[in-house]
């Protein structure tokens, strides 16, 4: 029930595919990142400090506090969405196609950032993606779904070396860039 779920919600956060539509255009970066902290009944100084820490973690300057989503690039917006999730110090981060709306250079930067954050903060990810190149670069284990059915589940290395289903083989083949 709702009462039992409430404490668990702080343990996980989600970052959506399209950072522009997931950010409120009326809130600046500071308000966006700090919004969830308001529920924690923290002192203003601590909220401010945690916002600064979150910006630093995602490699955005403190000066971005006053910017609005329309003033940011796609990669910067995705970093704000990550900071908004990280500021609550979750144990699990659900990443729903977090790089699909970004160009390849920005994708690589976000994947590198996600790897660093995972190592530094011991965060687990559920990474949802159709881009197997990004999955290969970031994930340790892969669960392949087809029409809500589990096709296979194994280490990323084994999945790419020895896929167990024809469907997975086709996905891998289709993801190879010429």
What positions do the PLM features span?
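A short, proline-enriched helix->beta-strand linker immediately N-terminal to the Walker B motif
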Residues: 87-91
């Amino acid at each position: 029930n709702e009462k039992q779920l409430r404490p668990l919600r702080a343990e996980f956060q989600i970052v959506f595919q399209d950072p522009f539509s997931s950010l409120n255009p009326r809130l600046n970066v500071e308000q966006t990142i700090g919004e969830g902290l308001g529920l924690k009944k923290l002192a203003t100084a601590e909220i401010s400090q945690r916002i600064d820490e979150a910006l630093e973690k995602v490699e955005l300057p403190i000066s971005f506090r006053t910017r609005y989503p329309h003033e940011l690039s796609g990669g910067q917006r995705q970093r704000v969405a990550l900071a908004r999730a990280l500021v609550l110090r979750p144990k699990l981060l659900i990443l729903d196609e977090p790089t699909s709306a970004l160009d390849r250079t920005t994708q690589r930067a976000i994947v590198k950032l996600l790897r660093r954050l995972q190592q530094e903060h011991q965060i687990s990810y559920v990474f949802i993606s159709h881009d197997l190149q990004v999955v290969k670069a970031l994930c340790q284990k892969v669960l392949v779904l087809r029409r809500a059915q589990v096709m296979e589940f194994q280490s990323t290395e084994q999945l790419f070396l020895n896929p167990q289903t024809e469907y997975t083989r086709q996905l891998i083949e289709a993801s190879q860039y010429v």
